[in-house]
């Protein structure tokens, strides 16, 4: 039996945490009889370790440092943390959200024999960076998409205790979901600030105004984080253009919701559409989850979400690629990289049209639901996992086996 260690932020409330749990689930389901699978539970920034994991998974968790050399080591993290500690090393990463990554990341992914990415966009970023920096990718680069849990994210399971939404007086609300990350107004990666600005600018002073439900946080769900988010909302609303006029209501949802509660939020009758101006996604899980509702999705057709969205069925926000602003740059989002900047005038026209002529957008929302149900459930992505396991088996056959001397 091969000794396998999977290092990931498995217990965290993060995008990488969700992706890790999908990978681990499929590995255990397929290989538990052949592999002795252990888990390393790693942090992910300041995100909380609050995701409930099963007792079986808890029993598999081992402490650092590892006291043995694994036959297979699987790391679900950013490329700079990849380590070749086993006979077969597999990396899983969403890479960066810019159109290029640091050139040294090509050396990082080459430490592994296999690297799994969640979208064609991420793969293309690695390939384009390798080409522009005259480097060769030596690892096997495989796209295995993320998926949604069809037993949770469904209109048939739209119950759940979200009584707090009863406090919302408006019967029509746009929903936006995403962490509020570093960057000036209009420059944070999820573009939460741009969502607020464009929504308020669209409906300010109108006789009839919808609401915006904002499910966001910084890195934690602490009181201090909530206060910071409220302050950042205030900074957006403090623009001179919004002075001395009535503004639409914004309702902040700040806290840890279960998958069932998120599904209830998506399907709540007051939530009529999702609105996102994201600049870039490695994948874009909340967009996929919301697509299961059959409601309109107002979003750019760019980066990782292109894999699971259909351009004909979304309410597409137009825009262009622009350099990443210095206020949003870091070791992953580098100077010289570009990402999407929306045409705010176009986005505001779409918001107004969806609000005024909502019935015109319902059919395409239902078509998008059919599209994701057909292609991005757990069962639908299994052929991609088949491809991955075929590659793993090929490499696995080359691992030296210990034999007993007679």
Predicted feature locations:
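Conserved catalytic-core segment of nucleotide-activated headgroup transferases in glycan assembly
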Residues: 19-21, 26, 150-261
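Donor nucleotide-sugar binding/catalytic pocket of nucleotide-sugar-dependent glycosyltransferases
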Residues: 113-124, 132-159
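Acidic donor-binding loop of glycosyltransferase active sites
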Residues: 264-282, 292-295
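Short hydrophobic beta-strand element within catalytic cores of glycosyltransferases
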Residues: 296-299, 315-316
């Amino acid at each position: 039996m091969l000794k396998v260690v999977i290092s990931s932020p498995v217990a965290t409330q993060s995008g990488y945490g969700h992706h890790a749990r999908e990978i681990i689930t499929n590995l255990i389901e397929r290989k538990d009889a052949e592999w002795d699978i252990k888990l390393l539970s790693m942090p992910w920034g300041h995100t909380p370790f609050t995701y409930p994991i099963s007792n079986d998974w808890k029993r598999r968790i081992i402490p650092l440092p590892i006291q043995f050399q694994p036959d297979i080591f699987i790391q679900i993290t950013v490329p700079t943390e990849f380590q070749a500690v086993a006979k077969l090393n597999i990396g899983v990463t969403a890479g960066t959200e810019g159109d290029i990554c640091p050139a040294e990341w090509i050396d990082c992914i080459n430490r592994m024999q296999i690297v799994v990415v969640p979208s064609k966009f991420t793969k293309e970023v690695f390939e384009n960076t390798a080409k522009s920096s005259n480097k060769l990718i030596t690892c096997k680069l495989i796209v295995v998409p993320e998926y949604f849990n069809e037993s949770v994210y469904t209109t048939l399971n739209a119950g759940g205790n979200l009584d707090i939404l009863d406090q919302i007086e408006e019967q029509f609300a746009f929903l936006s979901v995403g962490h509020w990350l570093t960057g000036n107004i209009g420059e944070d990666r999820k573009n939460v600030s741009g969502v607020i600005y464009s929504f308020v600018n669209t409906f300010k002073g109108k006789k009839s105004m919808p609401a915006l439900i904002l499910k966001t946080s910084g890195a934690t769900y602490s009181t201090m984080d909530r206060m910071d988010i409220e302050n950042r909302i205030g900074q957006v609303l403090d623009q001179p253009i919004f002075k001395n006029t009535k503004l639409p209501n914004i309702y902040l949802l700040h806290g840890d919701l279960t998958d069932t509660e998120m599904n209830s939020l998506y399907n709540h009758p007051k939530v009529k559409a999702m609105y996102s101006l994201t600049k870039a996604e490695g994948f874009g899980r909340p967009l996929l989850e919301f697509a299961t509702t059959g409601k309109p999705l107002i979003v750019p057709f760019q980066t990782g979400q292109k894999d699971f969205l259909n351009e004909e069925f979304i309410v597409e926000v137009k825009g262009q690629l622009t350099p990443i602003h210095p206020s949003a740059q870091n070791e992953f989002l580098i100077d010289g990289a570009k990402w999407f900047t929306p045409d705010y005038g176009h986005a505001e026209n779409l918001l107004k049209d969806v609000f005024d002529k909502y019935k015109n957008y319902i059919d395409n929302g239902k078509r998008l639901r059919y599209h994701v149900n057909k292609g991005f459930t757990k069962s639908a992505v299994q052929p991609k996992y088949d491809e991955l396991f075929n590659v793993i088996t090929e490499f696995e056959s080359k691992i030296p086996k210990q034999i007993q001397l007679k």
